Amino acid sequence: MSKRAYNFCAGPAALPEAVLLRAQSELLDWHGKGLSVMEMSHRSDEFVSIATKAEQDLRDLLNIPSNYKVLFLQGGASQQFAQIPLNLLPENGSADYIDTGIWSQKAIEEASRFGRVNVAATAKPYDYFAIPGQNEWKLSQDAAYVHYAPNETIGGLEFQWVPETGDVPLVADMSSDILSRPIDVSRFGMIYAGAQKNIGPSGIVVNIVREDLLGHARSLCPTMLDYKVAADNGSMYNTPPTLAWYLSGLVFEWLKEQGGVEAIGKLNDVKQRTLYDFIDASGLYSNPINKADRSWMNVPFRLADDRLDKPFLVGAEARGLLNLKGHRSVGGMRASIYNAVDINAVNALVSYMAEFEKEHG
């Protein structure tokens, strides 16, 4: 096998090489059963054992309390933008949303189709370069829930704190930062995460839902989108995305082997500091985000001259540094350094950036 590239893609993102090799070894013959996971009945003892272990490993990693259900559902976070209000927002109720970037805005736009949405805070006055402090928020006393995105992958903002919402359930889109450092699940009513950044391949979404929030779906909510139906059926009301579920389980196993979320969080801290410290000391590269709000997972940066963007990307690809082009809506560069992107990848990127600056700075 030729040397694997360093993949800085925002999603679908890098997967641990050990997970890929394990999946490769089991692809044609899972545990001597003579068939692939892709060919198994989702109701077979074999796949049920895979699903059960994946859930337990995730519970162990995040210390999920027993009064929370863990769901493995089809689709991604964008589907949750509709599924959440269909399950949690009463017909005549309202929900509070926090706007810190493009993904927050997509959630707001979709929820507005199903009821009243109060944008309780927005980063717009800060040009989305900083997160408004909670003293600036205007939360509703009667909100059904408060929704926010702890990490905005495109803008590169990340909450370094958990909002206080009292008795109002806090709903978090953790698609891009789940499992990147320890969290207290009990502070949330619901956590959801599309898999293709820090969990596994695309096509599956993980929902961690407090039990008292189940059973309140609207009458018009499709059966397939009802969280209680999913919970009552072990996430198997219909045939689930079995391969993605299995691969996610392998990632959970790998994370436990690395020492769990606390250990991976320390590694992620080293990675993000290595990259930001280099950018801040550079004369060619810059990051516009307020330092207290910088994302650990998604690091956007610009070159002083946009005309250097193309040669920078060409040189990066020649060195096996892939998918560094920034999102089309903001331009520049973006390095996504999720759990599976190790410090060697970050060091290789910094080394190339220094070399490029020496030639073009």
Residue ranges and their predicted role:
Residues 16, 195-276, 359-361:
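Active-site C-terminal subdomain of aminotransferase-like
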Residues 4-55:
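A glycine-/small-polar-enriched, mobile loop at the entrance of the PLP active site in fold-type I
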Residues 34-80, 87, 102, 110:
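Conserved N-terminal alpha-helix of the aminotransferase class I/II PLP-enzyme fold
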